[in-house]
Swiss-Prot record:
Listed InterPro entries: Histone_H1/H5_H15, Homeodomain-like_sf, Myb_dom, SANT/Myb, SMH1-6, WH-like_DNA-bd_sf
Protein name per its UniProtKB record: Telomere repeat-binding factor 4
Gene Ontology CC terms, in alphabetical order: nucleosome; nucleus
Coiled-coil blocks: 245-282
Chief location bin: nucleus
Length: 296
């Protein structure tokens, strides 16, 4: 038997890879019996080869289902960014040409290496307002079977001013509210979409929101301050962009976790198939020699 505590050497790994290329994965006994590889793998067993091949086969960026996939420390960074944005709106700086976005604090965990195309995240500052929009839409869309994301989005878009990527953010907010028990998620056997409707907790948790009408030609009272609107707009855009990225990262982590579980399931099935094949071959060899085998 092999010694699993003995660290694998480069020669042993090369011999294992050469054996898999020659005999195929799962043919551990054949690899150990190969005259060209027997010397390098003399201290290893078929179980050692199987475990080592599994470690080499799993992609380095994917963890098994038993390992918890830890969310990157970016949620706190997004919240700090939104908090700084709110503070800057309340007490704007009066420096001549400095941009308020440049004054936002940066930490080591806030430097996100994320593709620029992933620009959706929930804005924690506007989350209560978005929840109010959702509750208002479901209150008016009185469907006993629930309403899907498209119906809720169309209702809100016709009555409120929303960001360009509000549809994706709406889907995330609906899942969160359903997980918190504030909405009821309805499942349909023949549908791949999710449907939502109000429940008893929705009436308790519902918070009124101030409706934001679509743009009109009315003048704002804050036009007396020439720099105020532009500063607030830049800060809000920065906080929304940071929040959008958080939701996209969470979605990608869910996909990664599902892929890891599927890979582990397929590998387990392959191992079981290899073991059954080895047993069948041994039985065939015994029977071909005229021996009688008894099956319990």
């Amino acid at each position: 038997m092999g010694n699993q505590k003995l660290k694998w050497t480069a020669e042993e790994e090369e011999a294992l890879l050469a054996g898999v290329r020659k005999h195929g994965p799962g043919k551990w006994k054949n690899i150990l019996r190969d005259p060209e590889l027997a010397e390098q793998l003399s201290s290893r067993s078929n179980i050692d080869l199987k475990d080592k091949w599994r470690n080499l086969s799993v992609a380095p960026g994917i963890q098994g289902s038993k390992d918890k996939i830890r969310t990157p420390k970016i949620k706190a960074a997004a919240f700090h960014l939104a908090a700084a944005a709110a503070a800057a709106i309340v007490t704007p700086t009066h420096s001549g040409h400095s941009s308020p976005v440049a004054t936002l604090p940066r930490s080591g965990s806030s430097d996100l290496s994320i593709d620029d195309s992933f620009n959706i995240v929930a804005d924690p500052k506007n989350a209560p307002r978005y929840d109010g929009m959702i509750f208002e839409a479901l209150s008016n869309l009185t469907d006993a079977n629930g309403s899907d994301v498209s119906a809720i989005f169309n209702f809100i878009e016709q009555r409120q001013e929303v960001p360009p990527n509000f549809r994706r953010m709406l889907s995330s907010r609906l899942r969160r509210l359903a997980a918190q028990g504030k909405l009821e998620k309805v499942s349909h056997l023949k549908s791949t979409q999710n449907f939502y409707k109000m429940n008893d907790n929705s009436l308790v948790q519902r918070t009124p929101h101030v409706a934001r009408p679509k743009e009109s030609n009315t003048k704002s009272r804050q036009q007396t301050n020439s720099q105020g609107p532009s500063i607030s707009q830049q800060i809000v855009e920065a906080s929304i962009t940071a929040a959008y990225k958080l939701v996209e990262v969470e979605n990608k982590l869910d996909v990664s976790k599902g892929a890891a579980e599927e890979i582990e399931r397929l590998m387990k099935l392959a191992e079981e198939a290899d073991e059954m094949l080895v047993i069948a071959r041994e039985m065939h060899e015994e029977c071909s020699q005229g021996k009688i085998m008894y099956l319990n």
